[in-house]
């Protein structure tokens, strides 16, 4: 069967500007349409069930960011000053290469490559690759930061949604996009992005660490599209190619053709789960940066579809009937958390993933109250306790669900007090064009939960003892798709109505 646990997310960020740099040929290696440079994600989409996609149109100019994913916007505008005299000042700088053209330190992300003059303000330059040991040591810090960022996002999403409505989002998807934006972010934008993402200042090696989070169950691919008149810096192109396995592709002057090109990429990289992301493309669109994460996970132990039946679920002040998956001896790690007054349960999935469910302890407790009490420290304590808990045969009742969410991310960014994302974004490391602005940012998620699993249930009959543990999900709940290896949420959300 097709779907077991299916999640799809899309994030769309469109950047538009008045015009490109006055000299579009300055420091731009992306003017050649690399149609032959196919993104590596195309063959991976069909292997997973959870899919996430991010669309961005930022103009980032990479200048001196090492492999760190921390970039914030600074008020430093690097105008087209490198276009007037691209290579006439190499001898005035006592660099180690007296007469070598400094305009092509591309394809290898050199460590000590001289950056273009930036009039005193910080602007990211060539990226320094970290060793495997450094990247590995960064992963624990990144996982912890992703937990903090996920809880920030959860509360921001919850505040923007109507009361008692379903929602689902991928913090990993959004973080992946914003981290790639960091490659080209200047001063204040860099600082603010680091703060929003809960990254330490100058978080080196974050891009490689993030790449390491893509495991067999989670596939991440990226692609950049840009208008012909937009000069993208070589440093950003090379960093994106090395760290995100994508090379920019040039859009045409035909909006319909561009729309088809982008939607086709989306469909391929979400296994056709999202066949049409965009219905139209703004005429002033300059850059589209896409990141698709497709995650496949099946139940470690299969639910028997024959045991799925219509059962009561408490929704608002009424009781509705929904398809409930049932098992008398399903392996569940669970306990009662007194801080949240909630039942916490963890179900194993394939590829070292798990589904964590937090449901109010009884009908007297509301999901809203549980959400308000859910802080990063409380969440981390719960996950640590789950890690020490054993999976035991449990009488499990869990609704079959499908949740689709679409959210304007600009309002979320404002909720997170990151106002410069809309008004004063500094992407000097991506392009010299100072006029680029974010015109749209969308995040879409689809969650589908059905019975199919990886391993067949054991055929041996086991008598059910009277003391059998019970975990019933018959009222609104919060869910987390958890990466057990790297310890971070891939997806989060809540379910009020399993039918929606």
From Swiss-Prot:
GO terms for biological process: blood circulation; blood coagulation; complement activation, classical pathway; fibrinolysis; innate immune response; negative regulation of complement activation, lectin pathway. Residues 1-22 form the signal peptide. SMART domains: SERPIN. Sequence repeats lie at residues 85-88, 89-92, 93-96, 97-100, 101-104, 105-108, 116-119. Changing residue 408 to V: In HAE1; phenotype consistent with hereditary angioedema type 1. Highly glycosylated (49%) with N- and O-glycosylation. O-glycosylated with core 1 or possibly core 8 glycans. N-glycan heterogeneity at Asn-25: Hex5HexNAc4 (minor), dHex1Hex5HexNAc4 (minor), Hex6HexNAc5 (major) and dHex1Hex6HexNAc5 (minor). Changing residue 489 to R: In HAE1; phenotype consistent with hereditary angioedema type 2. CDD domains: serpinG1_C1-INH. Changing residue 477 to S: In HAE1; phenotype consistent with hereditary angioedema type 2. Changing residue 11 to R: In HAE1; phenotype consistent with hereditary angioedema type 1. One of its GO terms (cellular component) is extracellular space. The record marks 466-467 as: Reactive bond. It holds the Pfam family Serpin. Residues 85-119 are annotated as: 7 X 4 AA tandem repeats of [QE]-P-T-[TQ]. It is found in: Secreted. Interacts with MASP1. Belongs to the serpin family. This is Plasma protease C1 inhibitor. It comes from Homo sapiens (Human). The gene is SERPING1.
């Amino acid at each position: 069967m097709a779907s077991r646990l299916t999640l799809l997310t899309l994030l769309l960020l469109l950047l538009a500007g008045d015009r490109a740099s006055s000299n579009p040929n300055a420091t731009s290696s992306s003017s050649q349409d690399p149609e032959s440079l196919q993104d590596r994600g195309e063959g991976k989409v069909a292997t997973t069930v959870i899919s996430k996609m991010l669309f961005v149109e930022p103009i980032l100019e990479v200048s001196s960011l090492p492999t760190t994913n921390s970039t914030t916007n600074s008020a430093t505008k690097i105008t087209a000053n490198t276009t007037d005299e691209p290579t006439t000042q190499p001898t005035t700088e006592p660099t180690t290469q007296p007469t070598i053209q400094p305009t092509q330190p591309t394809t290898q992300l050199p460590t000590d490559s001289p950056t273009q003059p930036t009039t005193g303000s910080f602007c990211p330059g060539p990226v320094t690759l970290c060793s495997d040991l450094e990247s590995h040591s960064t992963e624990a810090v990144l996982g912890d930061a992703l937990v903090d960022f996920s809880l920030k996002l959860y509360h921001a999403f919850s505040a923007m949604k109507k009361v008692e409505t379903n929602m689902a989002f991928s913090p990993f998807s959004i973080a992946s996009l914003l981290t790639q934006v960091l490659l080209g972010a200047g001063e204040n934008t860099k600082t603010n992005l680091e703060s929003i993402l809960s990254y330490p200042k100058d978080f080196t090696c974050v891009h490689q660490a993030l790449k390491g989070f893509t495991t067999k169950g989670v596939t991440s691919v990226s692609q950049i599209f840009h208008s012909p008149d937009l000069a993208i810096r070589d440093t950003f192109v090379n960093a994106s190619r090395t760290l995100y396995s994508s090379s920019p592709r040039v859009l045409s002057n035909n909006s319909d053709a561009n729309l088809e090109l982008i939607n086709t990429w989306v469909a391929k990289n979400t296994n056709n789960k999202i066949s049409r992301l965009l219905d139209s493309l703004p005429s002033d669109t300059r850059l589209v940066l896409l990141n698709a994460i497709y995650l496949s996970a099946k139940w470690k132990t299969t639910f028997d579809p024959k045991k799925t039946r219509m059962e009561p679920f408490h929704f608002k002040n009424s009781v509705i009937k929904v398809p409930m998956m049932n098992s008398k001896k399903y392996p569940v790690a669970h306990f009662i958390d007194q801080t949240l007054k909630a039942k916490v349960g963890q179900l194993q999935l394939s590829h070292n993933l798990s589904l964590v469910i937090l449901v109010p302890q009884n009908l007297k407790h509301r999901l809203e109250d549980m959400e308000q009490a859910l802080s990063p420290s409380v969440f981390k304590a719960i996950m640590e306790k789950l890690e020490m808990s054993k999976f035991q045969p449990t009488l499990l009742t869990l609704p079959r669900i499908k949740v689709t969410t679409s959210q304007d991310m600009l309002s979320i960014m404002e909720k997170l007090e990151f106002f410069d994302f809309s008004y004063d974004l500094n992407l000097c490391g991506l392009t010299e064009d100072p006029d680029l602005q974010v015109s749209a940012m969308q995040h879409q998620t689809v969650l589908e939960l059905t019975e199919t699993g990886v391993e067949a249930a054991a055929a041996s009959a086991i008598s059910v003892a009277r003391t059998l543990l019970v975990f019933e999900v018959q009222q609104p709940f919060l869910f987390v798709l958890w990466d057990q290896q790297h310890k971070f949420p891939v997806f989060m959300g809540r379910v009020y109505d399993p039918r929606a």
